[in-house]
Amino acid sequence: MTALSEQAVDYNLLKNRFRGFFPVIIDVETAGFNAQTDALLELAAITLKMDENGLLVPDEKCHFHIQPFEGANINPESLKFNGIDIDNPLRGAISENVAMSELFKMVRHGQKKADCQRSVIVAHNATFDQSFVMAAAERTKIKRNPFHPFSIFDTATLSGFMFGQTVLVKGCQVANISFDGKKAHSALYDAERTAELFCYMVNHLKKLGGFPHVAINS
């Protein structure tokens, strides 16, 4: 790319910031670590947009409590960790099929609005969340999965690079983002904090003059 064409790119447009990718924050709570056998119990997603100053900010969100799929493994230790009572009727849990359909609908709408080509999962320790989303998509056989099959943005890695901290609460503390440990392991709360952290890192790099990148001659 020539210097002239580089200057012509408007990086205040989301479609140009991540090479056509539409970033979507995801957080899941599960009944174990194996996406193929263990139940997906809760999912939250937050789309992002550029504001009038070209800064990345949260946009739309969705949040679902999900019924274990038929034959799913339920690990009691996982339920003790995330505090989910799968038998509580007040959960208002819905089927994986409905949850994934609504998730994909929201993501495709945001992706189209931003004129992006593909969506990418942004999560803390993202391979875990991605594995459960993809496994649920495969089980429900919903067509037109908007997410890239393997590319991800992992905020644990990015936070380690930016701040030397890989734990979500630690990264938030460095970025001066409030974090209530009592609310942690709620998919929606963790997704909201992850969205704030990701936006902070992207915007901070821009404010420092690190993006768009200009190579330094050695």
UniProtKB/Swiss-Prot annotation:
SMART domains, sorted: EXOIII
GO biological-process terms attached to the record = DNA replication proofreading; tRNA processing
| UniProt entry tagged with the keyword Magnesium | yes
Q: Which residues bind Mg(2+) 1?
A: 27
Q: Which Pfam families match?
A: RNase_T
For activity, the cofactor(s) needed are: Mg(2+)
Q: How is the cofactor bound?
A: Binds two Mg(2+) per subunit. The active form of the enzyme binds two Mg(2+) ions in its active site. The first Mg(2+) forms only one salt bridge with the protein.
The subunit structure is: Homodimer.
Swiss-Prot/TrEMBL keywords: Exonuclease, Hydrolase, Magnesium, Metal-binding, Nuclease, tRNA processing
Domain (Exonuclease): give its ranges.
24-198
Q: Where is this site: Important for substrate binding and specificity?
A: 33, 81, 128, 150
- Its recorded name reads Ribonuclease T
Question: What is the native source organism of this protein?
Answer: Histophilus somni (strain 129Pt)
Q: Which Gene3D superfamilies match?
A: Ribonuclease H-like superfamily/Ribonuclease H
- Annotated HAMAP family: RNase_T (MF_00157)
Which residues bind Mg(2+) 2 per the record?
27, 29, 185, 190
Q: Which GO terms describe its molecular function?
A: 3'-5' exonuclease activity; magnesium ion binding; nucleic acid binding; RNA exonuclease activity, producing 5'-phosphomonoesters
Q: What is its EC number?
A: 3.1.13.-
Cite the InterPro entries for this sequence: Exonuclease_RNaseT/DNA_pol3, RNase_T, RNaseH-like_sf, RNaseH_sf
- The active site lies at 185 (proton donor/acceptor)
GO cellular component entries: cytosol
**Role description:** Trims short 3' overhangs of a variety of RNA species, leaving a one or two nucleotide 3' overhang. Responsible for the end-turnover of tRNA: specifically removes the terminal AMP residue from uncharged tRNA (tRNA-C-C-A). Also appears to be involved in tRNA biosynthesis.
